[in-house]
């Protein structure tokens, strides 16, 4: 019995030792697999050494427990020997992989060549300590709980990602100067550019963002910032096996927005790359184009995480299949958030607008493409908070903030738009559905003039819960030809109802994989701010086909002065969506906010205005005398356009004047405001209420809406109503003066440094500025910065020593979207 007990005591530790050895071998094998097949999300760098991956059994040996026989030690040693063999095999693979990776690295330019590169304004910002505190606007949030992760720490070497297949040399460079580059691209080869430029196809056929461009005298404007995947220019077919393109610098002014917001900094091309140097050899040393040729992501001087915009094979085949329907196409694109709906819709749109002549159906698009955007959070051709129907006639190449509105007859126009007042339709699903149905009716009316006009519907990522009910209802009601769902991972509780609705509507359901690797340098909220800022700073001169951006801050922009009371009253009322507010608070709610300018087309323009009571308040309504009639328009830009009266009595019955400011508060509803009927109203655009002048009873509105659009609405006897929704606060407008002042001071310091350098090289003292004058100008600029920083809701960080290091670390960080695929995940995190 004693011997048996000793055997049992000696055998007791055996299972634990076996489990430990088995776990160690599994960890080593998993590490070996991870080394041989690195994931796409990880940076491709030299694998860690053997020492860094020491297994538990490779650590310092521990003495065996008392009473453990030597036989068990021998068995463990045998397993350790097996583990060491596995380690040697792993180490051999690591060395082989490291050698292969080293051989694949391109030859780096010498430090002297890097010093010879010209510096841009953004690069000088990086060298000046004054810039570090300006990056506060893009600081990531820690511990986000709404479906997003903090930026991945990529302090190690940046992954060298291949971008262009074409390498420029003397044989494929036709001509070049400091503004233009003409190259020859062989078939199935590609070229990737960073920046913004005009593209001219001279010979052959090239594809860009889904569009096939044939030789023509037309120039295509392309915007390729680092905030999105870079467009790839690929040769589809050519003459003598190659296509010939000319790329030219363009000066649209969009790069000037970096002086107004840190979100627009470091998104365009930096220093000249090796390819740029090759094509600028005969140009001055300071020459710099608005675009740069990139072979790999390592060519970027800012060391950003750049990726090319490539399509999945399933995406390409689906786009070709859908395009063959021609004018009969009516496709709804839906799926979870961050699944690539907008990218797929943009590719399909461009492909339809530029079909290849050799298509099987011989379809030639002359009627354009209708684009029904039902995503108010991230719209393609309008600022946030709107759903709209657009009629496109030309492909578009760029992110949404490069075309925040459509007013060009050449590119396309907005047929009709409705203001939802929020970035998600879940705030008022009924109003959202009514707006979608009205826009669909407008598309059917558009078919009378353009019978071969296909339709693309972009549905938001609100696909769970109530959003799924809305999506299935739209599938059954809109008479679609196709439904595309952008996720192969389901979930089944979404795919099954969607498939049943598509089957009832006799529309095939196509399931595609979602967009891979969602690494972005700007969050969704930041991209909305960029798009909104671009919307307010963009202008379209009549004599120029492409838009221009002005760098003047909103506070210095000439506003529209609109009377809200009196004989020249220009607006019918002010509506606040959502819950009822006290009229005393209307000025605070309205001042400094973003409002929609809505044209009321019918007396019955408010939903439910005959069903429920109007506004219930504690203050008595002010009597409306002869000076507060709504018969006349405002002085600018609608002065002199008489209004008729059919709409006035119906709106006047629901207007309450605020006791102090005499603002016209329009409210219909019971507890919450009833929205305007989409069938009897349309949104003309957005405006920023810069101030409310109570003494003159006027509003100062800053808006990019053309005065002719408002004048046309008034000539048709349509009343103007300002609608205050639940959009993001215009923080970008508050801080514009501060960033503009810092940019002005930076430019002045750079000019002084340039003069000092010229003085040292030329020994001329004529251009020297007196020290007293320098001090006086510097004091004026610093005072301007101080005054610009003394505004509410903005904190200026004066001590930038630690903040600058954080900003440098953020430049090496990425935002990683964590996709949720379960019911109830329709909420988007506030980054």
From Swiss-Prot:
GO terms for molecular function: ATP binding; polynucleotide 5'-hydroxyl-kinase activity. Residues 8-37 have a biased composition (Low complexity). Residues 113-126 have a biased composition (Acidic residues). InterPro entries: Clp1/Grc3, CLP1_P, P-loop_NTPase. It is found in: Nucleus, Nucleolus. Residues 1-161 are annotated as: Disordered. It holds the Pfam family CLP1_P. The keyword Nucleus applies. It is an enzyme of class 2 (transferase). GO terms for biological process: cleavage in ITS2 between 5.8S rRNA and LSU-rRNA of tricistronic rRNA transcript (SSU-rRNA, 5.8S rRNA, LSU-rRNA); rRNA processing. Its EC number is 2.7.1.-. It comes from the Eukaryota. ATP binds at residues 335-342. Keywords: ATP-binding, Kinase, Nucleotide-binding, Nucleus, rRNA processing, Transferase. GO terms for cellular component: nucleolus. Residues 79-97 have a biased composition (Basic and acidic residues). PANTHER family: CLEAVAGE/POLYADENYLATION FACTOR IA SUBUNIT CLP1P, POLYNUCLEOTIDE 5'-HYDROXYL-KINASE NOL9. Polynucleotide 5'-kinase involved in rRNA processing. Belongs to the Clp1 family. NOL9/GRC3 subfamily. This is Polynucleotide 5'-hydroxyl-kinase grc3. The lineage of its organism: Eukaryota, Fungi, Dikarya, Ascomycota, Pezizomycotina. The gene is grc3.
């Amino acid at each position: 019995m004693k011997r048996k007990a000793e055997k049992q005591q000696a055998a007791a530790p055996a299972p634990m030792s076996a489990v430990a050895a088995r776990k160690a071998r599994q960890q080593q094998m998993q590490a070996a697999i991870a080394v041989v097949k690195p994931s796409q999300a990880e940076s491709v760098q030299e694998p860690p050494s053997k020492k860094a991956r020491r297994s538990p059994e490779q650590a310092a040996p521990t003495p065996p427990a008392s009473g453990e026989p030597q036989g068990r030690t021998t068995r463990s040693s045998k397993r350790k020997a097996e583990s060491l063999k596995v380690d040697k095999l792993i180490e051999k693979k690591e060395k082989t992989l490291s050698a292969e990776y080293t051989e694949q690295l391109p030859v780096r330019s010498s430090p002297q060549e890097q010093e010879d590169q010209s510096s841009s304004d953004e690069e000088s910002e990086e060298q000046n300590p004054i810039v570090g505190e300006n990056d506060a606007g893009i600081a990531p949030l820690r511990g986000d709980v709404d479906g997003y992760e903090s930026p991945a720490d990529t302090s190690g070497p940046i992954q060298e990602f291949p971008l262009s297949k074409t390498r420029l040399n003397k044989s494929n460079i036709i001509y070049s100067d400091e503004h233009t580059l003409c190259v020859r691209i062989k078939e199935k080869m590609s070229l990737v550019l960073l920046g913004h430029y005009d593209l001219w196809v001279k010979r052959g056929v090239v594809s860009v963002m889904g569009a096939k461009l044939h030789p023509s005298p037309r120039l295509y404007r392309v915007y390729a910032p680092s905030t999105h995947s870079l467009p790839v220019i690929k040769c589809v077919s050519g003459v003598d096996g190659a296509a010939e393109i000319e790329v030219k610098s363009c000066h649209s002014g969009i790069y000037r927005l970096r002086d107004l917001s840190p979100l627009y900094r470091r998104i365009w091309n930096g220093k000249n790359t090796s390819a740029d140097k090759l094509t600028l050899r005969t140009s001055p040393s300071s020459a710099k184009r608005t675009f740069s040729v990139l072979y790999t992501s390592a060519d970027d001087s800012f060391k950003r995480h750049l990726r090319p915009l490539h399509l999945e094979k399933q995406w390409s085949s689906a786009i070709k299949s859908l395009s063959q329907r021609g004018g009969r196409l009516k496709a709804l694109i839906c799926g979870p958030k961050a699944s690539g709906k907008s990218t797929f819709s943009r590719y399909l749109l461009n492909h339809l607008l530029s079909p290849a002549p050799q298509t099987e159906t011989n379809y030639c698009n002359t009627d354009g493409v209708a684009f029904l955007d039902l995503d108010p959070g991230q719209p393609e051709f309008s600022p946030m908070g709107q759903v709209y129907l657009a009629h496109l006639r030309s492909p578009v190449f760029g992110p949404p903030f490069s075309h925040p509105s459509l007013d060009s007859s050449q590119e396309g126009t907005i047929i009709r738009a409705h203001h939802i007042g929020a970035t998600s339709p879940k705030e008022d699903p009924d109003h959202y559905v009514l707006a979608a149905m009205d826009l669909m009716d407008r598309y059917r009316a558009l078919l009378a003039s353009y019978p071969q006009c296909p339709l693309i519907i972009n549905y938001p990522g609100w696909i769970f819960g109530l959003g799924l009910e809305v999506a299935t209802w739209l599938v059954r009601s809109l008479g679609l030809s196709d439904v595309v769902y952008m996720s192969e991972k389901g979930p089944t509780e979404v795919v099954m109802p969607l498939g049943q609705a598509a089957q009832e509507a006799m529309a095939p359901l196509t399931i595609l994989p979602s967009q891979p690797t969602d690494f972005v340098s700007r969050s969704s909220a930041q991209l909305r701010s960029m798009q909104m800022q671009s919307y307010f700073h963009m202008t379209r001169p009549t004599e120029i086909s492409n838009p221009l951006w002005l760098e003047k801050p909103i506070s210095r922009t000439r506003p529209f002065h609109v009377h809200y009371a009196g004989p020249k009253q220009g607006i019918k009322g002010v509506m606040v969506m959502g819950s009822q507010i006290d009229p005393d608070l209307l000025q605070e709610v309205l001042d400094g906010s973003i409002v929609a300018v809505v044209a009321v087309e019918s007396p019955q323009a408010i939903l439910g205005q005959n069903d429920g009571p109007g506004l219930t308040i504690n203050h008595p309504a002010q009597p409306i005398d002869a000076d507060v009639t709504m018969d006349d328009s405002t002085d600018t830009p609608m002065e002199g356009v008489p209004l008729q009266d059919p709409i006035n009595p119906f709106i006047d019955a629901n207007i309450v004047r605020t006791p102090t400011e005499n603002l016209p508060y329009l409210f219909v509803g019971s507890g919450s405001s009833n929205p305007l009927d989409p069938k009897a109203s349309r949104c003309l655009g957005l405006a920023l209420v810069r101030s409310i002048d109570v003494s003159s009873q006027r509003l100062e509105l800053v808006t990019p809406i053309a005065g002719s659009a408002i004048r046309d609405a008034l000539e048709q006897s349509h009343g103007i109503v300002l609608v205050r929704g639940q959009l993001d606060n215009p923080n970008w407008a508050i801080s514009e003066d501060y960033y503009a002042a810092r940019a002005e001071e930076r430019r002045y310091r750079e000019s002084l440094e340039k003069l000092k350098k010229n003085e040292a090289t030329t020994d001329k003292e004529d251009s020297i500025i007196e020290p007293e004058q320098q001090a006086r100008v510097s004091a004026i600029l610093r005072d301007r910065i101080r005054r610009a920083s003394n505004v509410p809701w903005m904190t200026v960080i004066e001590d930038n020593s630690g903040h600058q290091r954080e900003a440098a670390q953020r430049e090496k960080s990425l935002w990683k979207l964590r996709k949720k695929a379960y019911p109830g995940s329709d909420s988007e995190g506030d980054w």
